[in-house]
From Swiss-Prot:
Self-association and partners: Homodimer. Interacts with the N-terminal region of SSX2. Interacts with the GDP-bound forms of RAB8A and RAB8B. The interaction with RAB8A is prevented by phosphorylation of RAB8A at 'Thr-72'. Interacts with the GDP-bound forms of RAB3A and RAB3D. Interacts with DCDC1. Interacts (via the N-terminal region) with TRAPPC14; this interaction mediates RAB3IP association with the TRAPP II complex. Forms a heterotetramer with RAB11A where RAB3IP homodimer binds two RAB11A subunits.
Molecular function terms from GO: GTPase binding; guanyl-nucleotide exchange factor activity; identical protein binding
Name the record gives this protein: Rab-3A-interacting protein
Activity regulation statement: Phosphorylation by ATK1 alters its GEF activity. Complex formation with RAB11A and RAB11FIP3 and ciliogenesis function are competitively inhibited by RAB11A-WDR44 interaction.
Length: 476
């Protein structure tokens, strides 16, 4: 049917004609929802239908019969049933924009010998093209001569009406996605800030942990160092105390020796009262004849002289002592000590074992010599080296077989040397001399003047002289 014939038709006639069954077309449910395929025309011309059709085509029973129908012999009643509307209505633009055409696969029509050859369905693209042509015919547009449309619509206007809706949906979707993206970016930014804050906290805690560890190690090292210093100080004080104890023991022995040696050897006799002198009774042989003749014996009194200890200082030696007293020193090269070394110390400490004697002198000078009694100590505790240098029955300095009641130790050595009482007295006399002059050097002797100090030194020299001559005192 051409468009020119439809130009003069009224609205009712055109609508009735539109309701009549059309030859060669299938039934289309115009009241169905808008087809997704038509909405997809704007987006892609090659997009295929993805939803299942919702329109069921109901062909006439005669169309399904096996008897072939001659061409151009179809009646209106033989066409597929048309959709039934409650009342005729005019489609406006809003309704057209919401119409969805669902096209199913066409059923084969029994036309003159053609139905036997159509065994396969047409593609979705062909169906879409047919549907579009049908739409263009159904809208009854008059594009050729520019006359007004019967329904006041055209394909272009329908597309224009439908396009803003799709664009609006896309814009809304784009805006929603954009908002979600912005929200996700804000959340990501917050997460990044939180991670950065936690990283700073972690770094700060790590730095504080390192500082705390370093301070703890430093404090521990400081405590260990202080403990080591205290231990070393305590050991030093203990060693000094032991040295002082040894010195005090030597001083006690020296004082005991001084007390024993200071007693007078010959007491002074006092004159008898009345001016009488003591006499000793006795008899003498009378050599003269007059004595015999007298017949009497004459008693002769024996008068003993009264003696006392006297002392006089050697001026040269006294002057040397005064010079040494002004600047006391333990250097043996000074004149005062050099004379004492030559006259008293060397002779007193000269023994047959010269090497051991030199070691004893060095220990006495350094104040590192110790003397202890043997007592009742078992022999098994005596070291082999000490036994080799002398045993309880052999003196290590003289090499003679003597009963050794004492033993000496030199410095930090672990060896002990057994000595006889004679050697012990000679060593202690020298030790007493060195102890006293050390006190003078350290300023500990304050209750005596120079003369008293000098005579005390001379008394100690006297003890050394007696010891080197063989005079000694043995403890019982």
């Amino acid at each position: 049917m051409g468009l020119k014939k439809m130009k003069g038709l009224s609205y009712d006639e055109a609508f009735a004609m539109a309701n009549d069954p059309l030859e060669g077309f299938h039934e289309v449910n115009l009241a169905s929802p808008t087809s997704p395929d038509l909405l997809g025309v704007y987006e892609s011309g090659t997009q295929e239908q993805t939803t299942s059709p919702s329109v069921i085509y109901r062909p006439h029973p005669s169309a399904l019969s096996s008897v072939p129908i001659q061409a151009n012999a179809l009646d209106v009643s033989e066409l597929p049933t048309q959709p039934v509307y409650s009342s005729p209505r005019r489609l406006n633009c809003a309704e057209i924009s919401s119409i969805s055409f669902h096209v199913t696969d066409p059923a084969p029509c029994s036309t003159s010998g053609v139905t036997a050859g159509l065994t396969k369905l047409t593609t979705r693209k062909d169906n879409y093209n047919a549907e579009r042509e049908f739409l263009q015919g159904a809208t009854i547009t008059e594009a050729c001569d520019g006359s007004d449309d019967i329904f006041g619509l055209s394909t272009d206007s329908l597309s224009r009406l439908r396009s803003p809706s799709v664009l609006e949906v896309r814009e809304k979707g784009y805006e929603r996605l954009k908002e979600e993206l912005a929200k996700a970016q804000r959340e990501l930014k917050l997460k990044d800030e939180e991670c950065e804050r936690l990283s700073k906290v972690r770094d700060q805690l790590g730095q504080e942990l390192e500082e705390l560890t370093a301070s703890l190690f430093e404090e521990a090292h400081k405590m260990v160092r202080e403990a080591n210093i205290k231990q070393a100080t305590a050991e030093k004080q203990l060693k000094e105390a032991q040295g002082k104890i040894d010195v005090l023991q030597a001083e006690v022995a020296a004082l005991k020796t001084l007390v024993l040696s200071s007693s007078p050897t010959s007491p002074t006799q006092e004159p008898l009262p009345g001016g009488k002198t003591p006499f000793k009774k006795g008899h003498t042989r009378n050599k003269s004849t007059s004595s015999a003749m007298s017949g009497s014996h004459q008693d002769l009194s024996v008068i003993q002289p009264i003696v006392k200890d006297c002392k006089e200082a050697d001026l040269s030696l006294y002057n040397e002592f005064r010079l040494w007293k002004d600047e006391p020193t333990m250097d043996r090269t000074c004149p005062f000590l050099d004379k004492i070394y030559q006259e008293d110390i060397f002779p007193c400490l000269t023994f047959s074992k010269s090497e051991l004697a030199s070691a004893v002198l060095e220990a006495v000078e350094n104040n590192t010599l110790s003397i202890e009694p043997v007592g009742l100590q078992p022999i098994r505790f005596v070291k082999a080296s000490a036994v080799e240098c002398g045993g309880p029955k052999k003196c290590a300095l003289t090499g003679q077989s003597k009963s050794c009641k004492h033993r000496i130790k030199l410095g930090d050595s672990s060896n002990y040397y057994y000595i006889s009482p004679f050697c012990r007295y000679r060593i202690t006399s020298v030790c007493n001399f060195f102890t006293y002059i050390r006190y003078i050097q350290q300023g500990l002797v304050k209750q005596q003047d120079v003369d008293q100090m000098f005579w005390e030194v001379m008394q100690l020299r006297k003890e050394m002289s007696l010891a080197k001559l063989g005079y000694f005192k043995e403890e019982l």
